[in-house]
Amino acid sequence: MSAFPISDIGGSWEYSHAPPTATSATGIPGFPEQSVGGLQLPFPGYTYVGASPLTQPRRHFPNSTPVLGNYAGLSSDREVIATSLNPYISKFSANAEWPISDIHQSKKSVYIPEERDVSNQFQTDKQQQQQFMKLPDPQMQVQLCDKELWDQFSRAGTEMIVTKTGRRMFPGYRIKISGLDPTAKYCVMLDIVNVDDHRYKFQHGEWTVAGRGEPHLPQRFFLHPNSPANGSKWMSEIISFHKVKLTNSIGRDVDGKIVLNSMHRYQPRVHIVRTDDISSVHMQRLCTFAFPQTVFITVTAYQNSEVTKLKIDNNPFAKGFREDGARAKKPRNQHNHFSDNDTSPYSEQRRSYYEPGSYTHLPYYNNSPMNVPSHHHYDNQTMNREFLPEAKRNRIMPESNSIHAPSLSVFHPGNENAVSQWQDVPDLNEMYNANDNNYNSVANQSIHNVQYTQNGITSHSPVQPVPHDNSFTYYNSSSPSSSDSNQSNVNASFSVMTTTHASHSINDIMRISEHADVTSPNINIPNTVETNVHSSDSGIGSSPPTPSDDDASNLIPGTEEIFKDDGKVLDGENLPDMSDLISLTERKESGEANANSHTEDFSRNPACQSGDTIESKDIQTLQVASVTDTYSYQKNYVENSSHQSYNNSQEFSYHSNAMPESNCESSVDPNLDWESNLLTM
């Protein structure tokens, strides 16, 4: 164990070289002939421990004066202290060894070293000494590139980001080398050492010492990927260490990364080794260069705003943070926060469907199988169709707030099994614009008739017989023709259409009949048929009319037995079949008809109940609904010459427990009793 004189520790550190010794073989100041165990020590000033590099002094080197290498081996455990060119290592004589001696017996804890000449302990081998003491390249010079940029950062206080995954340095460490042997092989390395043992903090716009720093990790060298290479190659290009990454995490993936502690000051250094074998770099002579303006402080986030501005203005990868960069604020319009020329998927063309203020809730689509009623009831009737895009207008079907949503399936050839409006839905634009943009308009298409009301209720009526399955019953309807204008007979056909879809609620049917704009042709029924039906004020859903015994003469011939059973009038609950009720619609009151009138909801229109004349010229739709099941009875009248006025209600709602489930047209013979008619259905 060796010790330094206590009286000399407080002396000043000088940057002058030690005087040449008498035993110097090369004439270089501070390089005496030394050997330990027969091995010459070419670079005095370092304590050599095997082949591992020494920890450099924790003081900032004032200039870029090269520091001679520190790689050599020892065959002995003897510690040698020598004079060095580096004043930060030692300023004491290399020929003095300070042994431990006991001079003061009373103070055994105090030891005064005794100087002793140990020069005779070194064996001299001039050939080996010349080999190790020769400088690799005395004319070698290193120039720092981007010196002006480094000076700007140095004046502001350079900060480097360290992350767990590693962050590259900016400004990048780039150098230019000269004075090498063009034919010799060289390896270039980079390491980063700590400047002092302090931890820093940024306070009040400047960096101050915050306490003692954390223990520093062993140094790691970053070997340039082009190593080894000829001297001519190194001198012909700029050497860049832009791939070096700074990290604060010790992990397995440390290739190309240098581990540093945050909030500490560090100094990058460049080492040049003359060798052609990478595996023996640590055993070869090297030259080290350092530049004072490259000192930086490691941070996890930039502390100084001036440094941040310099990084943004000079780093090509930080263009997005500039005022005119991609992350700069752009003017936004009031609709979609995008410019008119923006091709973003959230542009106005695609976002108009979600324009705020058009409706209160998002649209609800009833696309459940078999139209199973959903528990989500959104107020879609307040929806403004003007905000809907073209694609959505052709697909969305408004729905009511009733428990059972109306069926939205379209019945036409090729779509018999449709259970959802997404399979085939008519163009609502055509229906909306069918009659001067009136909601109460009818779009008579080639395949089916669609009635679109203002309340958002739609109904579909096929006009041609199409193939059907067990789920649907189609009916045949006749349209008026000019060729049959002279015919005087009345063709009336009844059919029953049953479906497995969700049934219409009573309120839906009432809205359909209330806002329907479907007209029927003028019908002429013989005046011998008289009608005396007592309508209830309740309209749809009320009890059926019960004619008295005196009214039997006014019934349609052949229907007296329907209302007579052992001299008792049948009430609505005992009616055996809905087909019997159809005959009630045959009771008409003759009168003169006026042209261009509309069919109204007779059960709810006071004018109709009071006996006013109502005319019709197109198709009259009669629907009979029950509470449990809904059956649409539609009656088509074709009239060619005369007119017929109607009185009283044309829609009935009865309770029936015996509803015929038939998929074909039913023909009711008025000359038969109700039991025979039931069998024929």
Swiss-Prot record:
InterPro entries: p53-like_TF_DNA-bd_sf, T-box_DNA-bd, T-box_sf, TF_T-box, TF_T-box_CS. This is T-box-containing protein 2. It is found in: Nucleus. GO terms for molecular function: DNA-binding transcription factor activity, RNA polymerase II-specific; RNA polymerase II cis-regulatory region sequence-specific DNA binding. GO terms for biological process: cell fate specification; positive regulation of DNA-templated transcription. Residues 149-323 bind DNA. Pfam families: T-box. Its main location: nucleus. It comes from Halocynthia roretzi (Sea squirt). Keywords: Activator, Developmental protein, DNA-binding, Nucleus, Transcription, Transcription regulation. SMART domains: TBOX (SM00425). One of its GO terms (cellular component) is chromatin. Residues 521-534 have a biased composition (Polar residues). The gene is T2. Involved in the transcriptional regulation of genes required for muscle differentiation. Binds to a palindromic site (called T site) and activates gene transcription when bound to such a site. Residues 316-351, 456-489, 521-558, 589-611 are annotated as: Disordered. Residues 470-489 have a biased composition (Low complexity). Monomer. Differentiating muscle and tailbud tip.
